Curated annotation (Swiss-Prot):
SUPFAM superfamilies: dUTPase-like. The keyword Nucleotide-binding applies. InterPro entries: dCTP_deaminase, dUTPase-like_sf, dUTPase_trimeric. This is dCTP deaminase. The active site is at residue 137. Belongs to the dCTP deaminase family. Pathway: Pyrimidine metabolism; dUMP biosynthesis; dUMP from dCTP (dUTP route): step 1/2. DCTP binds at residues 111-116, 135-137, 156, 170, 180. Keywords: Hydrolase, Nucleotide metabolism, Nucleotide-binding. Homotrimer.
Length: 188
């Protein structure tokens, strides 16, 4: 299994629709102002956060249970940025839609710009033949409110190509998050 380069990522996105919309370079500015970078890097792709968020709230004082998740635990928010309360988290989704090839697995890591501010981005791997918008989780580990930005980089996806094709892909086993289009809550 080997990590894939910018050249491979560009080819797969442009010829096979692996990432849509796709940015072949690294974008660091928008209208003359600095932003958190996104687009193709040497051995990965920096994804962007869309302007739709679900911010965790404890208003209903319920137990957080992944098997019986209460949708009232979140407040929906749309905007260019989102404030995450202290020691809380928010869900978002990517701007980009992904179609992962059958012989590829991705690992997604948070960007250091956010990590250095105490904001941790958590995303699970994108499995072979998974497709959809990625649901992102932003944890604010600080005792202060923290801001995240829509339309800017938030995490980096690394692509690994296997030496052999898997017997059963995410699509084959009917994965529960296949084809997700919005911020998707836990499914048991």
């Amino acid at each position: 299994m080997s990590i894939k380069s910018d050249k491979w990522i560009r080819r797969m996105a442009e010829q096979h629709g692996m990432i849509e919309p796709f940015e072949p370079g690294q974008i660091r500015e928008n209208d003359g102002r600095k932003i958190i970078s996104y687009g193709t890097s040497s051995y990965g792709y920096d994804i962007r956060c869309a302007p739709e968020f679900k911010v965790f709230t404890n208003i209903h004082s319920t137990v957080v249970d992944p098997k019986h998740f209460d949708e009232k635990s979140f407040v929906d928010f749309h905007g260019d940025s989102c404030i995450i309360p202290p020691n809380s988290f928010a869900l978002a989704r990517t701007v980009e839609y992904f179609r992962i090839p059958r012989n590829v697995l991705t690992i997604c890591l948070g960007k250091s710009t956010y990590a250095r501010c105490g904001i941790i981005v958590n995303v699970t791997p994108f499995e072979p033949e998974w497709e959809g918008y990625v649901t992102l989780e932003f944890s604010n580990t600080t005792p202060l409110p923290a801001r995240i930005y829509a339309g800017e980089g938030c995490a980096q996806v690394l692509f690994f190509e296997s030496d052999e094709v898997c017997e059963v892909s995410y699509r084959d086993r009917g994965g529960k998050y296949q084809g997700q289009v919005g911020v998707t809550l836990p499914k048991a």
